[in-house]
């Protein structure tokens, strides 16, 4: 049966979420915008990801965290929901770490994406 599902993400930082979506080459739009299911049930989202089948997905901030909102029956992304969330959370964590290290005076020297999917980040801070 078609219905909109909310999936907990533990994502709290909007800018890091948007950077993570960009890093995954996922096109998104700022909300508020509505998404709907087959029966016309609608929900307003803060970040919208359009799908070719017009059953868009999005993120809505509830209390302190963003939740993924989607009609999973009409999921049309290159990965499964689980893989999508895994990759999104990895990129989100990477963005949080990178932003925090830059705020503390470090600069990124290099990053490597390993075959196992892990990311190696090298940062440095000069002391005078």
Swiss-Prot record:
Signal peptide: none annotated. Pfam families: DUF1257 (PF06868). GO terms for cellular component: cyanelle. The keyword Plastid applies. It is found in: Plastid, Cyanelle. Keywords: Cyanelle, Plastid. InterPro entries: Uncharacterised_Ycf35. Belongs to the ycf35 family. This is Uncharacterized protein ycf35. It comes from Cyanophora paradoxa.
């Amino acid at each position: 049966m078609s219905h909109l599902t909310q999936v907990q993400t533990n994502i709290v930082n909007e800018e890091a979420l948007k950077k993570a979506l960009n890093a995954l080459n996922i096109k998104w739009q700022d909300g508020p915008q509505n998404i709907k299911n087959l029966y016309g049930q609608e929900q307003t989202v803060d970040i919208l990801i359009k799908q070719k089948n017009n059953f868009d997905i999005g993120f809505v901030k509830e209390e302190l965290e963003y939740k993924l909102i989607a009609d999973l029956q009409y999921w049309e992304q290159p990965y499964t929901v689980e893989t999508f969330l895994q990759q999104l959370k990895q990129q989100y964590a990477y963005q949080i770490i990178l932003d925090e290290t830059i705020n503390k005076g470090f600069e990124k020297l290099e990053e490597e994406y390993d075959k196992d999917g892990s990311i190696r980040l090298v940062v440095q801070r000069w002391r005078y």
